[in-house]
Amino acid sequence: SEFKYRAQKIINYVADDYKWDASGWYNCNNPSDYGKYNWPIVVASFQKYGINNPKGNQYLTHFNTESCIYNRFHFNVVGETYIFTHYWDAPSVKSNIKDYLTAAWNRTDSYNLFTSEGTENHLAMTRTAAYLYAQIAKDSFPNDFPNAAQKLAEMKSWLMDWAAMLYTSGPGEWNSSTYLPFSITGWLALYDGAKDPDVRLVARAVLDYYAAEVALHYTQGITGGYESRNSSGYESVVNYGDYVGWLWFGESPKKITFTPGSQNNEAATAVYAASSTYRPPMAVVKLASKADILNSMYYNSKGEYLLNNPGAIKQTFYVGKTFTLGAAYLPYGGFTGGDTQFQMWKFVGKVAPDTTITAKTANVIVGYGGKEWNKARGRMPWD
C-alpha cells in the first residue's frame, strides 16, 4: 500500500542513513533528552532487520551508565518503553530492562514517572511510559516492585481521565506541527503494547483524535491554520508533525528524499508511527483529501493552555478548492518577554505537484501577530 511505502521509506532512512554516533552528538548530557535522537534508530533497526540486529542492540547497553540512566523523563522514557513493549525479546532489552525500569521507578523529583511536571506533551510521554513500566514491573518483576499493581491502576485512571478531557476540551497544544509526534508516541506504544483492552481502546480514541485534527488541517505536506506551540513549518514536509501527516496521508508536492548521514530528526521521530500497527480510520483518511468539505467553514474553540477557561480561543478554518485559511483569536493579553509559540493564522495554497524534484512547496502566508521572539506584542494586533 502507499502507507507501507511511505513507512518503509522512513524506516530505511533511520535504520541505514540517519547519522548515528553513540559517542558524539547523541551522548546523554548534550542533549539531556538523548532518547529523542537515539531511540528512533533502535526502533528502525529492529523493525527492518529484526531484534538480533547488532546496531539496534548497542544503544540500550551504551546508555546504561550511572550518568545517563538517571535521565528518565519524557523524551527518554517514551521511546524506551515503546522499544520494550514492541521488541521484548531483543537481547539488549532482556539484559537492560530491569536497570532502566529501576532507574525510572526510583526517581522522586519533579521528573518522576507518576507525578512529574512539564508541558502537555511532556506529561503525555511520561504518563504513558509510566503505565507501560508499571505493566512490565507487575508482570515481570512483581517481587521487586510490590506496588506495581497500584501504580498501574493509578496510571490507567490518569489515561482515561485525560482522554475524556481531550474530547471535552481539546488539547492545550492544539494543531501543533512541532509537538504532534511527541504527543502521540506514548499512545502508539499503548495501542500496541498495553495488555488491558480498555487501555488499548482509549489509546485508539486519542490517536483518532489527533489523526482527525491533522487530516482536517493538512494540505500538501503542511499543517494549515492556527497552531499552539509552533515556531516554524513554512515549507512542505519539513516539520515534525508534517512528516507524520505525510506518512498517514501522503499528498506531498515534491519528491521526499533523505540524505545519507544527515540528522533529520523531524523525519526520524515519525518512525514510531511508521512502525506501529495503528492506522487512521478511513473516514479520517478521506477527510485529509478534503474532497467532501470543499467551500466549507469549520468553527471550534479551545481553552487556555492548561485547559482552564473553556472556549476562550475562537477558531475558524475555511477549506477552498485550492487553498485553506485558518485563524484563531485569543482574547487575552500578556504576550511579553518571550516566544508565545502561537501561530494565529495561516494561508496554504496548493501547487501543481512534481515528484521528480525535491525543492517544491505549497504556498504559505503566516500571520505573526501572536508569535514573535522576545518581543512584547500585547493583545492581538487587530484588537
PLM region spans:
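Ser/Thr/Asn(+Pro)-rich, low-complexity disordered segments
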Residues: S1-M125, A137, A148-L159, E251-D383
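Intrinsically disordered, low-complexity regions enriched in Ser/Pro/Gly/Gln/His and often acidic
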Residues: S32, Y167, N239-G241
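Eukaryote-skewed repeat-based solenoidal scaffolds used as protein-protein interaction platforms
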Residues: T65, F84-L180, I184, L188-A215, ...
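General "foldedness" signal
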Residues: D144, H217, G224, S228, ...
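Extended amphipathic alpha-helical segments with heptad-repeat/coiled-coil character used for oligomerization
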Residues: I184, L188, P197-N265
